[in-house]
């Protein structure tokens, strides 16, 4: 099995990606388990931040690296919280504080204007100086609810309603979510690219 560092400290992302990637023969090790500090996310896009994170993890560990940068873009908010999704409520942000801030910010947004989209960019670097990283993007349309529902998932999942499923992302099973989510889409593209060379 090929050891690969996953450039995140987010336990939800580690669980979600590690289980799917282990089926592909990749031994995923979280960067925190290797003593790697988080890279500074100075990019202006999900793609830039994912490359920064992967390059940092590969450089520190000497291993191939996979990085994920993802977030929620709400149409009525001009794409916010976007790349700031994890820090939306400030320095001491938590999933709950971010979710509450978004609900408060959107309290006057009419129901027919609450469209949003989760985005996920996965980057694979074969080594720290890899000039041609694999970059895969997935997006998942939904609607921001007025109240949380469900206990699964993480982040904004309890207020992200998926019309095709008739429930929030937090009400989906892990298998259901992986099959249709932004991260599931990006991962499928990454696995296809790895498989084909």
From Swiss-Prot:
Catalysed transformations (reactions): XTP + H2O = XMP + diphosphate + H(+); dITP + H2O = dIMP + diphosphate + H(+); ITP + H2O = IMP + diphosphate + H(+)
Binding positions (substrate): 8-13, 70, 154-157, 177, 182-183
Biological process annotations from GO: nucleotide metabolic process; purine nucleoside triphosphate catabolic process
Record key words, sorted: Hydrolase, Magnesium, Metal-binding, Nucleotide metabolism, Nucleotide-binding
Residue stretches in coiled coil: none
Positions of Mg(2+) binding: 40, 69
Molecular-function GO term, any one: XTP diphosphatase activity
Cofactor list: Mg(2+)
Major enzyme class: hydrolase
Segments passing through the bilayer: none
Cofactor binding note of this UniProt entry: Binds 1 Mg(2+) ion per subunit.
Active site (UniProt): 69 (proton acceptor)
CDD domains: HAM1 (cd00515)
InterPro entries: dITP/XTP_pyrophosphatase, ITPase-like_fam, RdgB/HAM1
Family, per entry: Belongs to the HAM1 NTPase family.
HAMAP family: Non_canon_purine_NTPase
NCBIfam families to which the protein is assigned, alphabetical: PRK14822.1 (NF011397), RdgB/HAM1 family non-canonical purine NTP pyrophosphatase (TIGR00042)
Name used for this protein in its record: dITP/XTP pyrophosphatase
Species assigned in the record: Escherichia coli O6:H1 (strain CFT073 / ATCC 700928 / UPEC)
